[in-house]
Amino acid sequence: VHNLPELNLEHPAVREYVYGATDSVVRSHLREGVDGWRLDVAVDIGFQWLEELTRAAHAEKPGSLVVGEVANYPKEWFPALDGVINFTLRSIVLQAAAGDLDPALAQRMIDRLAAECGTAPLLKSWLMLDNHDTARLASVLPGQRQRRLAQVLQFTLPGAPCLYYGSEVGMTGGEDPEMRAPMRWDLVSAGHPMLAWTRRLVALRRDHRALRIGDYRPVTAQRLLAFERHTDRAADTVIVVANPGAVEVTETLMPANSKLMGTQPLVDRLGGRPRQKLRTGLLDITLPP
């Protein structure tokens, strides 16, 4: 394409033009007010050049953010990038919500990803359930229960929730170009159940510091998907428990948090269940599908 040339980053002059020189593309736009860069198909650039680009951005503007579109397992793309568009976590969430991935296996996958990548890079990454390159959420998960479970995980796992326009009102769309259809403004109404649910999740994340900046801790479970988000303050603790299965599950969980007192009642922020307390560090719970 004449106006979209393919640049050879192995050539030093090209690297200087893109991010190395003072008047390079990356540096000059940061000086003009841009706060970061979202790199399309970042895997094609490779580790070395991405790391140089990210360092150049930080040198020009400390605190700037470089996020890359990475469909690979994200571990080794840090610190070449500050964050990624987390396709791996998206796949785990959607398959677990659909019932195609056993909860215990999904839990082990998430735990490993969190341990290997580290919380800090994940917090700078984007967690999306659909975008312009994928089928829309309502088409992937037609059932409301499955969609809501996936959204809960999107807003409570480490990462910045990234919403695709129209998904908050249940827009459908399969392969290209369906998923890129114009916004369905006719679906927007104050009483739309999916919009109301999305707003509840936005408020939940806004109101709980642990969900925005907190560390991740696995919660030992077998048939439920469970984890904890916490900061250095015991009050900033959120235990997330989800039942992706089709039947009610009664299980004893182990949050393994020494700061949680048995006298402190736990409050259900989404389901409205009665308050309950830990029993010698364990949590007895019954959760419907």
Predicted segments, located by residue:
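Substrate-binding/active-site clefts of carbohydrate-active enzymes
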Residues: 1-32, 53, 57-59, 76
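Short, basic/glycine-rich phosphate-binding loops at helix/coil junctions
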Residues: 2, 128-130, 179
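Amphipathic coiled-coil/heptad-repeat helices and related helical stalk/stem segments
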Residues: 22, 146-147
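Conserved, mostly hydrophobic/aromatic
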Residues: 29, 39, 66, 132, ...
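Active-site-proximal helices and loops of the catalytic beta/alpha 8
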Residues: 35-120, 125, 142-144, 153, ...
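Carbohydrate-interacting/catalytic domains
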Residues: 108, 147, 158-163, 167-289
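Short, solvent-exposed helix-loop connector elements
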Residues: 135-142
